[in-house]
Amino acid sequence: MSECEDKTISYYNTKGADFQKSISTANMNDACDRFLAYFSRTAFILDLGCGTGRDSKYFISQGHSVLPADASEEMCKIATEVSGVTARQVRFEDLDYTNTFDGVWACASLLHAEREKLPGIICKINDALKPGGILYMSFKYGESSEERNGRFFTDMTENDLPFLCNVDNGFEIIEYYISTDVRPERSNEKWLNIIAKKCK
């Protein structure tokens, strides 16, 4: 457990209500639907770094089963209220599932992990997925790894795709795309979105 992680979790614990308000205009339904298109039946999805539970609620509305999970106690409380499903408080590196989920949705969450820790975390996500399972993850588009306004961020570009998904962690990329932030006031910010499949 690093100081960067502690600061980020503390941020969400103390500013949960403010964060919920700040993303109230963020509609991720298009990205969610793009992810859901890879499932031919009802899926069991781990919403990893679920935040307010916004996306968990949407997945449930589309007929899927979801487990919201977040390292922040306050975010888990909000997500439980929003989604109607009890969220699990757990850090990325403490994931302990095996062949459990059809999909893992990590929207704007893995970006809070330090770069050197991401390979191990992604291997744990691989363990949690059933064979052929689908992973979505998104990062702010860029090359920085730094603290910003009380939270730690690891940015990514297309050049980082082989680092994120490779033979060692058992993922192959199905598609990736660059999008603009869905919040009108942040339309100048870009995101790297990745959808990958568990291949081993």
Q: Which residues are covered by each model-predicted region?
A:
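Class I SAM-dependent methyltransferase SAM/SAH-binding core
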Residues: 46, 52-94
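Conserved S-adenosyl-L-methionine
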Residues: 171-181
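Core SAM-dependent methyltransferase catalytic element
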Residues: 182-200
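Conserved beta-strand signature within the Rossmann-like core of class I S-adenosyl-L-methionine
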Residues: 132-139
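A short glycine-rich, Lys/Arg-flanked "PGG" loop and its adjoining helix->strand segment in the class I
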Residues: 119-131
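Acceptor-substrate binding/catalytic loop of class I
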Residues: 137, 145-160, 183-185
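A short acidic, Gly/Pro-enriched loop at the edge of an enzyme's catalytic core
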Residues: 93-104
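Conserved class I S-adenosyl-L-methionine
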Residues: 1-40
